[in-house]
């Protein structure tokens, strides 16, 4: 990354505007999951300890732009952030008028999406945000794929713009996994539809040694290999795409392995009776909901010997006990591997948590959509703006 880093700058007495991703679930006026708040608090604390006069901004939910909505107020987030930091964090409603924060202090701007023009990357709004600071810090990887006033526009006009500790760590880990990976490199891409992840599959097919596919995506590849998938969810329109990707992987010496055996059931339910079948013998009235024991053993061997693993998506319906075995086997193999592993995406993080391997994954990515776009090789506007700023002010 060619952007400046917050840790390289002198923040003493400076007005520091930090864009964090504090978009967390709120239940009964309380933060229901504070993972993002705790992660952001570390960056905020660093800026405060460096003598910055810190104003934090974030979006929360999807309120109607340009209108105040008490339901989407940052107040519950400010309370939780204050508990973590050990100080009061005031929420400032009219923050665009200017906020007087003492040196080493912090305030939280009310929801940026209450400002008209935020999601449209409005130049006038971006300039007003930039006027509030001496240093703009982009630290929200989860929103870096969106060109909005608080993630992109403000960086164009701020006197100084840099990457915060969270964003820097995220880009470093992704770079390590994708730019110069230790081999063999394995990617796991799960999900219900090939159509939703076709760019990721395309990009990774040409980068990795093995690409393990899971969920409804795997069913489309099983159909492409010429097998019946019974009444499983799959996309007939993408069978040719799957065939092409398998051929392209083989042509470069890699592979997209097809499951040898699968776990099926007649109904999509946690009480359904699960059966194991070879992949060429799936009954017409059953659906594939997980990979079978032979396939798990094969994936286990591949993953334990991997130099790099990129994990995005489960291989079965892991939320239901009869169909959790495949994803559990992946999780345990990744945990046991000496290779560098990175996991991202909501379902993947839920699986990492469920199978208790959080501490054994080398890096857990906080960005859902941004993680996918990075895997696709796309330019993230929030990062590009920092790099352009650094180039213009070098």
Swiss-Prot record:
It comes from Halorhodospira halophila (strain DSM 244 / SL1) (Ectothiorhodospira halophila (strain DSM 244 / SL1)). One of its GO terms (biological process) is gluconeogenesis. Substrate binds at residues 21-23, 36, 59-62, 113, 146. Gene3D superfamilies: Phosphoglycerate kinase, N-terminal domain. Signal peptide: none annotated. This is Phosphoglycerate kinase. Belongs to the phosphoglycerate kinase family. It catalyses: (2R)-3-phosphoglycerate + ATP = (2R)-3-phospho-glyceroyl phosphate + ADP. It is found in: Cytoplasm. One of its GO terms (cellular component) is cytosol.
